[in-house]
Each structure stands twice: as C-alpha cells, then as structure tokens.
C-alpha cells in the first residue's frame, strides 16, 4: 500500500468497546464463570457488567488480568485475535506491502489475495482493511480494476464502522476515487475525491501527504473535463503541501500533473521542467515505473520543442526500461509516442508498424484507453497517408470508440478531425465539413 501518515490512533470508539464486551461475555460463559466470580476481589460485578455492555473500555492492564482469569491470550480478548496469530498476519501483510512498494505487482497481488481469507476470519477490522485495500491497489496495478472496485467497496463499508477515524475513511475514499478514475468514471471519481478531501481536512490529524495526493488526482479529473484553471489550482496546492512533508513520492506526483497541465496549455518548456523535477523525485525512490513514464513524456516534450534526436533517445530509453520491469503497457505507450514522431516526420510505414506494435503491448487495458485511442489514431493516419482508406476508416472508428469510453471531448474531437480528413480525401466535402464542425463545437467553452 502507498505510504501514509504515521499518526497516533484516535480514542477507541464505542463500537470497539462493545465488541470487546461481547468477547468478554462469550469467554466468561465458556469458562463457566459468573460476573461475580470473574470479578473476584479486584473488581465489582457491576464493573464487569459495564465492560460486557460496552459502557466501559478497560485498561491494558485490566485486559491482561481478565485474560489470565479466563485462561486465554490477552490479544484474543483485546482484539479477537491471539497475539501470535496477529503477529503472523501483520508480518505477512507487511511483506505484501513491501512487494507493492517495490513495484513487484504480480507478486504483491498474489500475496494480498492469499491474506484476504485469514484477515476476514481474524475479526480484526484494521487487519481486514489493510488486506482489502492492499489487494485492491495491487490489482489496479495489474489491470484488474473490476476486482479492485469490489474490494474497495467492501473496504468502504468496513471503514464506515465506528472503529476507524475520518483519516482512514478518507484514504479508502481516495483509493476508490483512483479506481473509478481509471475506469473512466470521471464524475464519480471527482465526487469521491471531494469527499475524501473533506474528511481528511476534518480529521484534525497530520495528513498533508494524503491531501496532496487527493489534490493531484482530482486535478486529473479537471483536466479530463478541460477545466485547466481548477486543475492548476489543485496542483499548486498539492505542491505546497508536498513541499511541507518533504515526501519525494508526493512531490513527484504533483510535479507530474503540473507537467501535464503545462503541456495541454502549450507551455512546453515549463512542462519539461516540471517533468524533469518529477522524474528526479521518483529516481530518488528508485521508482523505475514512474521514471519510465516520465521519460516517455520528456521524449514527447522534446519532440515538440524541436529536439527530435533527443526525443527518440528518450523514448527508446523509456521503452527499454518498461520492458525490463515488466510493464508492457508502458512500453506500448513509448512505442506509440515513437509512432507519432515517425508519422509527423513523414515516415508513415514505420509509424504504421509501431502503432500496431503499441496496440499489441497495450493489450486493451482500460486504464490505458487514452493511449489505445491515440495509437489507433496514429495507425489510421499512417494508413490514410498510404492511400489505404478502408483500413484507415476502421482505425479511426476504433479510435473514436476508445475516446468515447474515455469521455474526453478533446480526444473525441481529434478522432472527428481525422475522419473529416478521410472524408475530404474521398471527395465527400460535405461530410468532411460536418465532422470538422462537430470537432469545433466539442471544443467550445461557450455554447450560447
């Protein structure tokens, strides 16, 4: 699981006290003791009754004494899990989380999946939540977003119990928002990020890193909706918060989004600067996944700035690194970028080959649907330039379908422009004009 703030836990909730009371009563009855017999000379019957009804939370010392009287492990009474069993489960969860942090995605997913059953059976809500969220995040990494969504919905229901703090609930909502965003449910994701941010701010606990990450992801939603002012505001707040906690991962995420916004606004030198800062932050963590992704982006930005040879070298570096770490979809992104360069350089046959290769590597990943659509668009344009109009039309239609799934007006407009160019090539100028008009209207900010 991603690193989160280390904070003191809030006071135990009434519901947790009730669960402890229920365990005490069950263990007392199993031991054949009355409340008076369990209390002995140390406590009153009324005090034991208050504990069993959840009215009083006993101290650690009292829990240990009661457990000794009942002949059970103190951990079993305190949390429902024997101390040795809990330690084994916590150790296994820590190992799975380490695999996730090391970007060993397949191994992390397998490790977390094996722990879901034991965590649920433990009766310890905090261990269940760790297992559910860890498994969900690992599954997102390997493209299993539907399974991830089910786990996060279960985690959300669990976190809404009284055991957890607003901060812990905010984390779950944040991860749920990330999953929804990658499933292209942008409006739903935006609502989840808003709710997560409100909970984090309300928690009164140190959580600058979490707030910064929520803001960075919320900026993606604004970008998808072409509200670049809101996106920029969120990224600026994220950068301010991340500098305060001095967390390279959080800083890298904020600069990553700042670079994308500057790119969309045509500020390519600034976008390159932000991308370089983001890559430096991730390099300090030896996070080769994000280093590969940012190297790809730097390749594209250098091409836009006229540094063609440097751009190609960066994209080849990104491709090699992505393959080395087993990230086929990121390798596909780099090949798609190379195809774009070859198309714009007039090397249409090479662009076709690389666009097809990119689509193979992307493999239909829902979280890469924007890149899939872009590769389909490059493929279509390369075919159009070669005079293979029927094949080009099929590629453009596929790109439009991908962009429909993405829900981005600007991406959809690029597909309509391409189809307009195809119609013009066929001499159907009325249809071309209609498609160009559709694209222009999709990009209008004012409609009346």
Task: Give the ranges of each region predicted by the language model.
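Inter-repeat boundary and helix-capping residues of tandem alpha-helical solenoids
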Residues: 18, 85-86, 122-125, 129, ...
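Tandem amphipathic alpha-helical repeat scaffolds
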Residues: 90-103, 129-144, 168-185, 210-226, ...
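A short, Lys/Arg-rich alpha-helix, primarily the initiator
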Residues: 1-30
């Amino acid at each position: 699981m991603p690193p989160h703030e280390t904070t003191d836990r809030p006071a135990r909730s009434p519901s947790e006290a009730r669960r402890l009371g229920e365990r005490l009563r069950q263990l007392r009855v199993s031991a054949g003791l009355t409340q008076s017999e369990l209390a002995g000379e140390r406590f009153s019957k009324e005090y034991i009754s208050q504990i069993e009804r959840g009215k009083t939370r006993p101290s650690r010392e009292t829990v240990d004494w009661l457990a000794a009287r009942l002949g059970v492990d103190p951990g079993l009474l305190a949390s429902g899990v024997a101390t040795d069993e809990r330690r084994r489960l916590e150790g296994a969860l820590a190992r799975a989380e380490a695999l996730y942090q090391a970007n060993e995605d397949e191994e992390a997913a397998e490790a977390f999946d094996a722990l879901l059953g034991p965590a649920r059976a433990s009766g310890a809500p905090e261990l269940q939540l760790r297992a559910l969220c860890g498994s969900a995040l690992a599954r997102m990494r390997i493209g299993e977003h539907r399974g991830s969504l089910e786990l996060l919905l279960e985690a959300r229901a669990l976190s809404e119990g009284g055991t957890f703090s607003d901060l812990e609930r905010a984390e779950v909502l944040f991860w749920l928002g990330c999953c929804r965003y990658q499933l292209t449910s942008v409006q739903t994701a935006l609502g989840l990020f808003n709710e997560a941010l409100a909970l984090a701010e309300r928690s009164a606990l140190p959580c600058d890193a979490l707030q910064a990450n929520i803001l960075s992801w919320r900026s993606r939603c604004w970008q998808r909706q072409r509200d670049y002012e809101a996106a920029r505001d969120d990224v600026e707040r994220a950068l301010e918060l991340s500098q305060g906690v001095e967390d390279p991962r959080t800083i890298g995420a904020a600069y990553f989004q700042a670079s994308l916004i500057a790119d969309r606004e045509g500020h390519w030198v600034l976008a390159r600067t932000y991308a370089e800062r983001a890559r430096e932050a991730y390099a300090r963590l030896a996070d080769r996944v994000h280093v590969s992704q940012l190297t790809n982006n730097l390749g594209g930005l250098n091409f836009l700035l006229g540094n063609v040879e440097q751009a190609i070298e960066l994209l080849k570096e990104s491709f090699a690194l992505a393959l080395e770490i087993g990230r086929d979809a990121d390798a596909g992104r780099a090949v798609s970028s190379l195809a774009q360069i070859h198309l714009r350089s007039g090397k249409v046959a090479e662009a076709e080959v690389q666009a097809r290769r990119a689509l193979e590597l992307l493999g239909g990943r829902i979280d890469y649907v924007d890149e899939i659509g872009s590769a389909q668009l490059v493929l279509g344009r390369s075919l159009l330039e070669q005079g293979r109009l029927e094949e080009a039309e099929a590629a453009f239609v596929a790109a439009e379908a991908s962009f429909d799934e993405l829900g981005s007006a600007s991406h959809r407009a690029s597909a309509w422009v391409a189809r307009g160019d195809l119609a013009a090539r066929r001499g159907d100028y009325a249809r071309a004009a209609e498609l160009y008009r559709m694209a222009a209207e999709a990009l209008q900010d004012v409609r009346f």
